[in-house]
Amino acid sequence: PKYTFGYWWSRYWQYSDNEFVDLVQKLKSVDIPIDVLIVDMDWHETWGLRKKNPAKDEYGQRIGWTGYTWQKELFPSPANFLRWTENEQLKVALNLHPASGIQPYEDVYEPFTREYGWTEKGKSVPFHIDEQKWADAYFKTVLNPMERQGVDFWWLDWQQWMESKFTPGLSNTFWLNYTFFHHAEQQNPALRPFIYHRWGGLGSHRYPLAFSGDTYAKWETLAFLPYFTATSSNVNYGYWGHDIGGHMFKKETKATDPELYTRWLQYGVFTPIFKTHSTKDPRIERYLWFFPDHLFVMRDAIRLRYTLAPYVYNAARENYDTGVGMCRPMYYDHPERDEAYNVPEQFMFGNDILATAVVEPVDSVTGLAARRIWFPEGRWYDCATGAMYEGGRTEELHYTL
């Protein structure tokens, strides 16, 4: 769907419905567009996780890791919240960790067990997505009611055992991708199906848009992502999203580096999924307006993404038609040139944009950061500076923030 290529707001934090309203209003006030609102796991009851020493359930998960009952202290009226997102023309996704099955304290326990035919009342129902009857009951009684209220898609976040406990050799991640995608396909035949989940191995490109997991917020991570994203096209896995700004901090990191965050946003413009995110850590800040010296540069990056919307959507269509990723290594277009194999940090974004990331801070004296670029044959226009470059050579360029 077109909205997937817009700006996604996400952060693992205990936000209330009113705080989400404030967030969206603030984005509007500084002229930053948004299409997707991700509500991480605190949408549901997480009382077990908030204890000092959280207990574990019979599946080895911390109580509250899996959940399907809205946390009413934060969302007193889920229906009103979802109605508000619809009125704001926002698409909303909820985070799911389904490993602990259906617990007796969940609001959905009675309708699920009745539909499934579970006779051990008062006992949890194990996660068994590879059983048709279980899956049918799960989608019908657990997820469908929330979808009818206004949940647009699911952020599946499977992190537990790799293989099914019931079907030897079956990858849980791959099978979740398959079942959730086809559920979306059947639920709304008139809409393009879409899920957001983890890499499930070769062949998994058929189903999810994927996220690259819990990366550290550091320059080295940003430097690696262009190579990682582009070369994934070699296995037909072109739809990667990253936690822009980095997911988590090293122990010694004191606070968010606004320059790193800005450069990550600038790189993110030229990736398939454009999502800021982080873990629940008070040292990490994702509100752009907390960095007044960088805010307007950050805003320009997000607005550039929207300026490129027709181009991005066309690149996505080409990916659908040909299998060639939106981000692809330089050697796809220039296989005969040795240089194309020696610049893993740069890539083509669609057919006409050569992109890379600035992966070091600006010099304290000059205010510039260096970036070596190999230009293939032709004439190249630098959209950051307005300069023109003749192709067939490598240039060291210098950029302000």
Give the ranges of each region predicted by the language model.
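Catalytic-domain carbohydrate-binding cleft regions of carbohydrate-active enzymes
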Residues: 1-401
